[in-house]
Amino acid sequence: MATSTISARDDSPAPVPRELPPLLAQVRDGWRHRDGRTALIGAAACLALLAVLFRSTLVHFVQVWSTDQNYSHGFLVPLISLYFANMAAQYGPTRQVPAVGLGVFLLTMALMGRLATIVVPVGIASDLSFIAGLAGIVALFAGRDALSRYGFALAFLVFMVPLPIHLYTTIANPLQLMVSRFAAVILNGTGLPVLCEGNHLTLPGGVRMFVAEACSGMRQLTGFLALTTAVAFLTPRPRWYRLVLIGSAIPVALTANVARVVLTGWIMAYDPKLAMGTFHTIEGLLLMGFGLALLRAECAILNMIVEDDRPTGPATRPAPAAG
């Protein structure tokens, strides 16, 4: 009985080891060689030093992402960037020829940007300098080929950077006025008389509705830009397709916010209390869903155009004549 039990166990298949993600697999393979181990240790040391130098920048990121709904997607951006880097690692290891000159240049620019913000407190300079520092570490220890391959993953980190307040309001204020005017035209055209004064809409009965910055489209624009850029990168389509998809983030965000203001206007004309509190929150969720539906419809239309542009098949040659 014991012998049969042992033989049965011996005949059972050995468990298949789980494969590491490509990015981690490259790190593991690099650690097995002396040069690769030296490069990994140096990169880790530089990364730790960069985190210490930009500690206030990293804390600022977390604070803004946690408190400002315009940048609540910031927590996802580094994770998506890692996903893109893992995708790039699927193509195998790059030729590891450290680009010392380029790496030192990028790290020097990052350090200068960080020091400049101590003298002149311009937060975005430090934010972008941190990304430049990451690129410098890649170039210094992995080379130009690695920087080229993982360049998009690094560049995508730009979407986690909060805009300066002055720049944000410079963009948001015209969008507020644009959304207000378009919404007023639609409300008047659908039978609800509205007087538009800047970003204030006066409804029948003297009810006044204020189109706030949250309804300007900036909140959706920041998220949609990151989303459309990610989708464009993942979509195996022509370059013009990807550029159109990224550029459509602006009209999609504006259209969704105009629809929200129009819906709010009709509800406030019926009962202003219904447009407050919980409904306003639900309305924001519906707005995001509406924007995603617009993007999905746009992709469907663009896909039809791409399909129409594809050749129907290889040209057939006439059969050679007999004899």
Question: How should these model regions be labeled?
Answer:
Residues 2-323:
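Hydrophobic N-terminal alpha-helices or hydrophobic patches in metabolic proteins across all domains
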